[in-house]
């Protein structure tokens, strides 16, 4: 039976580097692992081939011999798992089962080292003007902070933590199991120290050995001009306290802007409706237009039609953390009066006659009808 090409088994080129080989192995090991293919003999054999290929190609000396002689006869090494100590199987199972797959270690190897604290999320409501022009706000949050009494060690001042006798300070316990596939070494979090590698025999009275305490803290937040609903403002180092001397997490302020009854916002542009009489729309006029900066004068031409939109350049919302501003758009609404006095009726009738909408001979009868309609 011809020997299989280990490069073909892993699906990589002969010139593949270590990272490419490891990536290919992870993908295939996840796909064909016996735990995922219970009772599938074909998958079990495939997994053995994948493991054997990886054992050879991941070892520079074995790979060199394999490339030169086309064989990897290393004392009948087979498909055992003894070479997996340098490969974190937890990475594979975390990607399949989610974070922290028990029994394989993964991130547990790093639990006794410094870790950044969790981030904190906070929502804040702003008025329309606060969002447009920017504002300084003070928020009050409850979060964990490093205990000042023990400076985060968790131990009573004047005492020290001790190395865990069960894991000898590593924070993890290795368990070797013999299976049909070979010798399998798994890494578990030490149940005595919780993965920290140390044990506190005399805990701090303030934090009860945790190294952190819950506190309410007031933080001033500078809201930049131009923010809008959905924007998130990061504040570095104001999250939960770090673990094992790690830095604190970050605070993320989520913005929600309350609507304004007059101004409508779309991005950095502002839209308003401007009501004018049909006479002013016909003759043209100077309007006093309300903007976020106050009133401005704007001339509209004669014959302006309902629905005409004028642009006031640079009168919109400031761009966040940038130069310039959006624009303001003015939508013209022509108001038609629901009632007219006698002089207004006569003026309109004169307009109709002047524009040829009625003939002189129709004047008396038509005017009588108009008078009846407006009584």
Curated annotation (Swiss-Prot):
ZnF segments: CR-type: 134-216
Give residues annotated as binding Zn(2+) 2: 164, 167, 190, 193
Instruction: State the compartments where it is located.
Output: Cytoplasm
| CXXCXGXG motif-type repeats, residues | 147-154, 164-171, 190-197, 204-211
Which cofactor(s) are needed, names only? Zn(2+)
GO terms classed as biological process: chaperone cofactor-dependent protein refolding; DNA replication; protein refolding; response to heat
Which Gene Ontology terms of cellular component type are present?
cytoplasm
May I ask which residue range the UniProt record assigns to the signal sequence? none
- Any idea which positions bind Zn(2+) 1? 147, 150, 204, 207
Q: Any idea which GO molecular function terms this record carries? A: ATP binding; heat shock protein binding; unfolded protein binding; zinc ion binding
SUPFAM superfamilies assigned to the protein according to its UniProt record, in alphabetical order: Chaperone J-domain, DnaJ/Hsp40 cysteine-rich domain, HSP40/DnaJ peptide-binding domain
Question: Where on the tree of life does the source sit, at the highest rank?
Answer: Bacteria
Which key words tag this protein in UniProt?
A: Chaperone, Cytoplasm, DNA replication, Metal-binding, Repeat, Stress response, Zinc, Zinc-finger
- NCBIfam families found in the cross-reference section: DnaJ_bact, PRK10767.1, PRK14297.1
Indicate what this protein is called per its UniProt record: Chaperone protein DnaJ
Organism field: Clostridium tetani (strain Massachusetts / E88)
């Amino acid at each position: 039976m011809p020997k299989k090409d280990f490069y073909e088994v892993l699906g990589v080129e002969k010139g593949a580097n270590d990272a490419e080989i490891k990536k290919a192995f992870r993908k295939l090991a996840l796909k064909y692992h016996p735990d995922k293919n219970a009772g599938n003999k074909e998958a079990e054999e495939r997994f053995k081939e994948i493991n054997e290929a990886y054992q050879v190609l991941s070892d520079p000396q074995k790979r060199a011999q394999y490339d030169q002689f086309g064989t990897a006869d290393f004392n009948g090494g087979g498909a055992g798992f003894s070479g997996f100590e340098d490969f974190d199987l937890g990475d594979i199972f975390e990607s399949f089962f989610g974070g922290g797959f028990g029994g394989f270690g993964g991130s547990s190897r790093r639990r006794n080292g410094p870790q950044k604290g969790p981030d904190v999320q906070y929502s804040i409501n702003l008025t329309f003007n606060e969002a447009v022009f920017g504002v300084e706000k003070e928020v009050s949050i409850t979060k964990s902070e490093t205990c000042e009494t023990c400076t985060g060690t968790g131990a009573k001042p004047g005492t020290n933590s001790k190395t865990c006798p069960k894991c000898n300070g590593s924070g993890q316990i290795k368990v070797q199991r013999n299976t049909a596939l070979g010798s399998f070494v798994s890494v578990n979090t030490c149940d005595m120290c919780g993965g920290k590698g140390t044990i506190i025999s005399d805990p701090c009275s303030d934090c009860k050995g945790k190294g952190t305490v819950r506190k309410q803290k007031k933080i001033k937040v500078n809201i930049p001009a131009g923010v809008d609903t959905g924007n998130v403002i990061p504040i570095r180092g104001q999250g939960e306290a770090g673990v094992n001397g790690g830095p604190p997490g970050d605070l993320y302020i989520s913005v929600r802007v309350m609507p304004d009854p007059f101004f409508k916002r779309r991005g950095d542009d502002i839209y308003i409706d401007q009501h004018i009489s049909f006479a002013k729309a016909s003759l043209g006029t100077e309007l006093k237009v309300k903007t976020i900066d106050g009133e401005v004068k704007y001339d509209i031409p004669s014959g302006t039609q309902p629905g005409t939109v004028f642009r006031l350049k640079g009168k919109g919302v400031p761009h966040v953390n940038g130069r310039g501003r959006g624009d303001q758009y003015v939508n013209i609404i022509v108001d038609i009066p629901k009632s007219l006095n006698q002089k207004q009726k006569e003026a309109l009738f004169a307009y109709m006659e002047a524009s040829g909408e009625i003939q002189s001979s129709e004047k008396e009868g038509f005017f009588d009808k108009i008078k009846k309609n407006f009584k």
